[in-house]
């Protein structure tokens, strides 16, 4: 079983995460940011990851540190995963009403993010939309994953939710075990 626990305790956040990559999509997420909980739940459900996340952040300031540090901790959990026999690449195109999100991933040990997301509104509830790209940067840098994404649409809720669903589906695909694969790199290491 590929299950990991990661804790982060700083002056800005206190986070405890439990991730089972080979889960069934069960989740219990409490970040203090309702919409962020919602999209992380969508990530877990559509990625079939069991995810438990308890966060106490400095939300009296704003949501930046909480969103950033969740990306860091989730990234570290995936970085701990054994890379031998994984499919390595994953992608998804997910519609949600008028919105469409595309995500492609390479679990190749090289963090890099190319993101096409321009928010039409500053907030969805108490979630700052400017933090969407920052979440994916924090995740990628700590998971050492190359991540490309694009999203179009009018409704901000639909755009961000479609993006997190696509992220879950693509990560599920890339983390699947295929015993034929070995290390999927001509270098022999990831």
From Swiss-Prot:
UniProt cross-references to SUPFAM superfamilies, sorted A to Z: Ribosomal protein S5 domain 2-like (SSF54211)
Cross-referenced Pfam families: IGPD
Superkingdom in the source lineage: Archaea
Alphabetic keyword roster: Amino-acid biosynthesis, Cytoplasm, Histidine biosynthesis, Lyase
GO biological process, one term: L-histidine biosynthetic process
Annotated EC: 4.2.1.19
Protein name per the record: Imidazoleglycerol-phosphate dehydratase
Organism of this sequence: Methanococcus maripaludis (strain C6 / ATCC BAA-1332)
Taxonomic placement: Archaea, Methanobacteriati, Methanobacteriota, Methanomada group, Methanococci
Gene it is expressed from: hisB
């Amino acid at each position: 079983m590929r299950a990991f626990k990661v804790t982060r305790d700083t002056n800005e956040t206190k986070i405890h995460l439990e991730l089972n990559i080979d889960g069934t999509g069960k989740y219990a997420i409490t970040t203090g940011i309702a919409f962020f909980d919602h999209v992380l739940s969508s990530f877990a459900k559509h990625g079939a990851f069991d995810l438990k996340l308890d966060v106490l952040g400095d939300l009296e300031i704003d949501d930046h540190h909480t969103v950033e540090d969740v990306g860091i901790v989730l990234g570290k959990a995936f970085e701990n995963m054994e890379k031998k026999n994984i499919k390595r690449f994953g992608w998804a195109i997910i519609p949600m009403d008028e919105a469409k999100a595309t995500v492609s991933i390479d679990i190749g040990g090289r963090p890099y993010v190319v993101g096409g997301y321009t928010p039409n509104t500053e907030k969805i509830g108490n979630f700052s939309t400017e933090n969407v790209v920052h979440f994916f940067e924090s995740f990628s840098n700590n998971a050492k994953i190359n991540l490309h994404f694009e999203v179009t649409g009018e409704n901000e809720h639909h755009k961000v939710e479609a993006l997190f669903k696509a992220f879950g589906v693509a990560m599920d695909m890339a983390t699947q075990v295929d015993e034929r694969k070995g290390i999927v790199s001509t270098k022999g290491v990831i």
